[in-house]
């Protein structure tokens, strides 16, 4: 996963105008404006994923791919991966179309954070992008509704309602994880 992520962000860095180049992913604090926007956007997305998991009856603290530590919302970290593109696309748009303004960031010790002006600019763009209607699982849905649909599908999979289980990469990984762990332990599958 780490290698793919590194390649993905190095390609993104090559595609945006030279004025906004960055050296891969960085957080806490971001080392550049692109990462500052991603960090803020992912923060919004984390809350949307956590909400979807709770509504579906899933424990956001359960760790399947990330460590199971009850002080961390590990399942949110697991489940968010295929949906990061919901933030990546609008952030890439901002930089590739020269919509970024220097007043969108403010310096902090060893990095930058999104300023109030940056948050006011990015948040509505993200929410508009989340609300766009797309075709997903043979229905017209808001982009953000993909997360809720997949969370319910995963919960149904766990209670053996497997009809039309989603074929997203995260769900295949989780299914393989569950199958291998239960098979190795000699226990029945959930």
Question: Language model features by range: what are they?
Answer:
Residues 1-190:
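Active-site helix-to-loop segments that bind/position phosphate- or nucleotide-bearing substrates
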């Amino acid at each position: 996963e780490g290698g793919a992520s590194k390649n993905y962000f190095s390609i993104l860095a090559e595609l945006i105008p030279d004025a906004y180049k960055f050296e891969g992913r960085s957080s806490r604090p971001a080392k550049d404006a692109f990462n500052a926007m991603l960090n803020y956007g992912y923060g919004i997305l984390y809350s949307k994923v956590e909400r979807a998991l709770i509504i579906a009856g899933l424990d956001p603290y359960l760790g399947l791919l990330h460590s199971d530590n009850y002080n961390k919302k590990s399942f949110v970290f697991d489940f968010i991966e295929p949906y990061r593109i919901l933030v990546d696309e609008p952030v890439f748009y901002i930089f590739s179309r020269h919509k970024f303004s220097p007043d969108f960031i403010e310096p902090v010790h060893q990095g930058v954070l999104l300023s109030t002006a940056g948050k006011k600019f990015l948040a509505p763009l993200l929410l508009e992008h989340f609300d766009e209607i797309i075709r997903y699982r043979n229905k017209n849905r808001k982009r953000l509704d993909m997360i809720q649909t997949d969370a319910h599908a995963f919960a149904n999979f766990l209670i053996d309602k497997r009809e039309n289980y989603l074929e997203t990469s995260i769900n295949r990984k989780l299914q393989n994880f569950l199958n291998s762990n239960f098979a190795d332990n000699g226990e029945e599958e959930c």
